[in-house]
Amino acid sequence: MSVSVLSPSRRLGGVSGILQVTSLLILLLLLIKAAQLYLHRQWLLKALQQFPCPPSHWLFGHIQEFQHDQELQRIQERVKTFPSACPYWIWGGKVRVQLYDPDYMKVILGRSDPKSHGSYKFLAPRIGYGLLLLNGQTWFQHRRMLTPAFHNDILKPYVGLMADSVRVMLDKWEELLGQDSPLEVFQHVSLMTLDTIMKSAFSHQGSIQVDRNSQSYIQAISDLNSLVFCCMRNAFHENDTIYSLTSAGRWTHRACQLAHQHTDQVIQLRKAQLQKEGELEKIKRKRHLDFLDILLLAKMENGSILSDKDLRAEVDTFMFEGHDTTASGISWILYALATHPKHQERCREEIHGLLGDGASITWNHLDQMPYTTMCIKEALRLYPPVPGIGRELSTPVTFPDGRSLPKGIMVLLSIYGLHHNPKVWPNLEVFDPSRFAPGSAQHSHAFLPFSGGSRNCIGKQFAMNQLKVARALTLLRFELLPDPTRIPIPMARLVLKSKNGIHLRLRRLPNPCEDKDQL
């Protein structure tokens, strides 16, 4: 038997040939990909030729325009320059079309287009596929099943829970008054709204605002909200594998594990309680049914119940949507009143007329605050908690002015742009609650702090109740004053925040009329 031995030069030649072929294949694939991106960009340019926009870089698009937390200023500039809608390019072949006209909003929100996958996929590890991220028939089934959880009869007992949480926050503020320095309110309000959600969703005992045992869970929730937004703004993090290898990816994984573990433990404990014979009747006698009770007892139309994974997703979605969004709304409302003392005093007089005898705030009081409600709505116009929402067109669409967009285009409904559109809101920077006076004429889609259409915020009433309770109890105890040295700079995150915080000075009111629960 003969054995042939390749010489070193022949072996090297074989390896070199393989490397050359591999390099050529990689180059060919890159050329094909580049050609695909070029052709796709050309298709987009043709599809969007009816929608002018500022000049963009061929690779980076308009990304640089939206750096340094200037997105909201850029949106306002576009609203004034480009009627109704304006594309903005990101990374060459990707584009979003911003809409900020009420007629355009009405068209899109009247359709059943799915949420934009590119904009919302980063939330999936955080909250799972609950009502916010679901689409199609599954979304419809979950929406129908969850609607009873937000019925007025269910929401009524929550008013007392909201008041309890607000009172704890105000007590903390009173302790801090001795420091004679402005108070950054958003962090306090965010913790208070999380406290309210914990009580409403889980019947949590005590207050996480003062419970040190809850700090790790609170930190995980806060970290996830920040990490998700940073991930959305980094093109390299769009790839799950790459993101998982980064420090932020590992941090996100740990925070998700902690948050999900907490939710899972609560769900399993409650399931075990409800499975005991007669336990449900005992619960009803002791307390109101909370969000988790209703989820566990609910059934689909086919008689099936939610899986543990679906339960966690819906609970985490409720926690996410009802926490930072409401905190943003309350914080900006307090700032708006601090900078408009006449409106603040008129709201206080209205609330004093309802609760001035020391009455506890109840469900029935919430509909007896017309001027306070007008001020809340005007603050939500100026500072919408959710700056924008995304949709991916499932079919072509034609707008009332004749312009059209093809299937597959991502549209961003800029609620901030809509609320700051001078063609919709004259003197738009003026805080004018009379815009929302009874009988005032408005386009049906000119004011969308809770979105609109079939996919509007299911917890709208819950949120409005909390805004009213927080506003009422705060004004009864404190006079709100702005800090002229630190004027808030609004910036778009998952919710509307301030780049430098929301700092207010508080002045304790003499002989405050507080609700009976404080006695």
From Swiss-Prot:
Name recorded for this polypeptide: Cytochrome P450 4A22
EC numbers listed for it are 1.14.14.80
Q: Which Pfam families match?
A: p450
The catalysed reaction is: an omega-methyl-long-chain fatty acid + reduced [NADPH--hemoprotein reductase] + O2 = an omega-hydroxy-long-chain fatty acid + oxidized [NADPH--hemoprotein reductase] + H2O + H(+)
Q: Where does heme bind?
A: E321, C457
**One Gene Ontology cellular component:** endoplasmic reticulum membrane
Q: Tell me the Gene Ontology biological-process terms attached to this UniProt entry.
A: arachidonate metabolic process; icosanoid biosynthetic process; kidney development; lauric acid metabolic process; linoleic acid metabolic process; lipid hydroxylation
Q: Which domain of life is it from?
A: Eukaryota
As for family, the record states: Belongs to the cytochrome P450 family.
What is the topology of this protein in the membrane according to its UniProt annotation? Peripheral membrane protein
User: What outcome follows a substitution of R11C?
Assistant: In allele CYP4A22*2 and CYP4A22*3
Q: Gene name?
A: CYP4A22
What is the annotated localization of this protein? Answer: Endoplasmic reticulum membrane; Microsome membrane
* Broad EC category: oxidoreductase
